[in-house]
Amino acid sequence: LNCSKLIKQQGLKNVVVTNGYICKEPLTELLYYIDAMNIDLKAFSESFYKKVGGDLETVKATIHHAAKRCHVEVTTLIIPGENDSEEEMKSLSSWLASVNPEIPLHITRFFPRWNMRDREATPLETIYSLSVIASKNLRYVYEGNI
């Protein structure tokens, strides 16, 4: 927060890249100094967030609140067998469009690394097909890590 204030005083822009885990009160205070956010929406199922130690509703609330105050973009890393279903992308993109259909969505390709070497990289066909699905609800959809 302190750095954001100093940066604004210098006439510069603040961009936050975040997983979206922040309570409403500090987020509200921070947003006075933020120009843009890229929020990682890991999946659109509570079960996935429980598995990775998070909470979908908190991230959704952050996206909703931030979108009222600054430019927001959302990134979803597509992991084979975890969050790569067409139904999940329909739900995710429909919900995001209900917040604002102008919010850009970045659908990015997973590559096996670290503790997740037990699966292959996301097939390109999956990224492209999920992008088509999301584009039915959102104006700006981009494929990444391809």
Protein language model regions, located:
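Conserved AdoMet/S-adenosylmethionine-binding subsite of the radical SAM
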Residues: L1-E120
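A C-terminal junction/extension of Radical SAM enzymes
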Residues: F111, A121-I146
